[in-house]
């Protein structure tokens, strides 16, 4: 098959018009979430899937001694509670979806044993011109998360960019230089430096960080994620559930309901587009350098960086994340943060933190801004 032959669907004005009809319509007939409840196992699987061993999430006896009296779920656990918020986009069949960011506010902690319901709807469609694939549609969803007491726990937006796979592969320029580089290779010394950061990673825990001890310009400890491996991506999917990962009869039923979902593999078997996270060949067909990480995974790493810093008595109030590039297998991310300001609002004290995540070549992968509520000695 010639490389220039069209293999996948295009973004058309007709398909966009059909999708626009769904704006502000509640999403009801959709996949059930991976998790309904913050059980001990669900929370631990989620935390371990993002490489987070904080005992506040993973050790119920430890959590029982916290000021909440119970273990908590990490703020990013919301990704496991609603598929639409996690990138299960509707419309534009055969057009790829790249998860690209979130803007979330948390109102209450998620406690061990809490049960959740959610509401979600398509909020907007915004057209962009991109280096990755030319014409792209930013598909924005709004979601609300409620606990068993019908209390609003969190609310916010997430978005994917819908891109034409053929256009990205054949005419996209974003990764021209990356594709020309030699494959990354790590020496023992390279790995030793990465592993030293893991060894030094500090979980603040029960050593309370007070607002009086924080000032603008304070640096957060560098957090490393990687080197990226398919094994790591699968570890995340184990806690998150994936979007299209199904087996046997359930895989068949999914393709019966969504025939445009199946992309034949090298054996001629229709399989899901989520394979871009573990198959280099399909990743190349959609225009990326190699198999790459999940967007919700990377957003969760940014929140992990903040929860490590804030300690058990802090609370993440807000996080906005922009994903700027893919992290293919072999990449390593270095997450850094700095306190931008300290402020008071409604009688509570907050630190605003700006974050960046650069890969091993110094290329920007993520930028984010978070607000953390901290206790005061006063």
Each PLM stretch: what is its role?
Residues 277, 289-293, 297-344, 355-360:
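Catalytic-pocket segment enriched in acidic/His residues
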Residues 2-101, 167-313, 377:
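Hot-dog-fold acyl-thioester-processing enzymes
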């Amino acid at each position: 098959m010639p490389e220039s032959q069209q293999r996948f669907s295009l973004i058309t004005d007709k398909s966009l018009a059909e999708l626009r009809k769904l704006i502000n319509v509640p999403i009801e007939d959709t996949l059930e979430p991976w998790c309904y409840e913050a059980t001990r196992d669900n929370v631990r699987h989620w935390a371990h899937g993002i490489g987070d061993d904080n005992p506040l999430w993973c050790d119920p006896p430890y959590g029982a001694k916290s000021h909440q009296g119970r273990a908590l779920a990490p703020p990013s656990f919301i990704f496991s509670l609603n598929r639409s918020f996690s990138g299960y986009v509707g419309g534009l069949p055969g057009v790829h979806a790249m998860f690209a960011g979130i803007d979330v506010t948390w109102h209450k902690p998620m406690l061990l044993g809490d049960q959740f319901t959610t509401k979600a709807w398509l909020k907007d469609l915004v057209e962009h011109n991109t280096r990755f694939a030319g014409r792209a549609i930013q598909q924005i969803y709004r979601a609300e998360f409620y606990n068993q007491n019908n209390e609003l726990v969190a609310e916010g937006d997430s978005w994917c960019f819908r891109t034409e796979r053929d256009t990205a592969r054949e005419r996209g320029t974003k990764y021209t230089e990356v594709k020309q580089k030699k494959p990354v290779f790590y020496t023992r010394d390279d790995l030793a430096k990465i592993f030293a950061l893991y060894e030094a990673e500090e979980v603040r825990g029960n050593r309370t960080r007070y607002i009086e001890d924080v000032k603008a310009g304070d640096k957060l400890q560098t957090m490393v994620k990687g080197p990226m491996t398919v094994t790591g991506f699968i570890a995340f999917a184990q806690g998150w559930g994936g979007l299209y990962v199904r087996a046997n009869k359930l895989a068949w039923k999914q393709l019966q309901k969504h025939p445009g979902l199946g992309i034949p593999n090298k054996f001629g078997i229709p399989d899901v587009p989520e394979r871009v996270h573990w198959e280099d060949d399909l990743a190349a067909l959609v225009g990326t350098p190699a198999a790459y990480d999940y967007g919700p995974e990377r957003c969760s790493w940014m929140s992990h960086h903040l929860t490590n810093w804030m300690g058990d008595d802090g609370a993440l109030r807000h996080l906005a994340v922009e994903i700027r590039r893919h992290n293919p297998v072999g990449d390593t991310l270095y997450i850094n943060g700095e306190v931008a300001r300290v402020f008071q609002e409604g009688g509570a004290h907050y630190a605003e933190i700006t974050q960046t995540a650069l890969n091993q070549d110094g290329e920007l992968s993520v930028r984010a801004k978070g607000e953390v509520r901290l206790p005061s000695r006063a």
